[in-house]
Amino acid sequence: MPNLWQALVLLPAAAVALCAVTAAAQNATETSDPSRVNRTTFKTTDVAGVKIFYREAGDPSKPTVVLLHGFPTSSWQFHDLIPLLVDRFHIVAPDFPGMGHSEAPSPTVLRPTFDDVGAVIDAFIAQRTMGPVILYLHDIGGPIGMRVAMAHPDRIAGLIFQNFTISVDGWNPDRLKVYEGLGGPETPEKLAETEQFATIERDTLLHKKGARLPDALNPDNWAMDAYAFSIEANRAFMSRLFMNIATNIPHYPEWVAYLKERQPRTLVVWGRNDPLIWPAGAEAVKQAVPTAEVHYFDSSHYALDENADAIADAIIKTFSPRPGMRN
């Protein structure tokens, strides 16, 4: 699908306006009852023939934060964070194709690549939000979100980096070698190697390794991901997307250049004990955006597991509306 970005990202202005009007009408209906505004709702929408599940909460007239999850999890990753932000922000959190409750499309509908998944999420954001958005970028949500930011820099009100690197220095070198080895044409051997990463055992390890109190973590955090693993189509899509991770590396210089040129409002919240993505990734963001606030936590790859309150406080401090400004 070589023209997917043209079809989804470069939407005609009239189509974007129509989406905004439709969303405004729906939001007006949904927020007319004050008791509903701060309640998380669960919805599914069609984006280019792919059913995308998402969580939504808060008043759409407030600044919008789009939460982009990691691998191999889903928007469930943010279930503790959303209630802490809902008084100040409008929250939208999609499940990526083939993950969580979203549909796992066949390769004839959507290729399991970061370019194509990024195009779908870009179109989803255009469809379900109005005005500039703040992007929360975790793990594979980072390269997906940066594609959105690069395509539409004027739609970005801010960026939140959480264990997502824009530099090879941010990778554990051993893991980087794995990703680079999986690149190129798909082979049965590569696919077999990749499938070992889309497992509940690996997911549990990422939650626990480096956590302050690993035995006190909520086991629902990885049990929810086990649901997606149990569906063959989801596991196949995730495995092939994992093989595509190395394609993000050539984009690092342009992402750094974007940050240096645009200087967006930026917050970095980082689990310093992450065995995959190291604190050098946070330092690379700070070098590109010197005004970025950086917070390290004695925690794992999934820093929200133990630090949702502190991360919510940092988001509120950095991105709460200023007088006379929506974002």
What kind of region is each of these model predictions?
Residues 299-312:
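Catalytic histidine-centered segment of alpha/beta-hydrolase-like enzymes
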Residues 1-11:
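Bacterial N-terminal signal peptides that target proteins for export
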Residues 70-73, 139:
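Active-site glycine-rich loops that stabilize anionic/oxyanionic intermediates
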Residues 72, 97-100, 166, 300-303:
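Alpha/beta-hydrolase active-site loop signature
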Residues 27-40, 49-52, 57-60, 64, ...:
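Flexible "cap/lid" subdomain of the alpha/beta-hydrolase fold that forms the substrate-access gate
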Residues 72-80, 91:
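Serine-hydrolase catalytic-loop signature spanning alpha/beta hydrolases and amidase-signature enzymes
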Residues 9-19:
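Bacterial N-terminal signal peptides
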Residues 67-70, 93:
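Structural cue for short, hydrophobic secondary-structure segments
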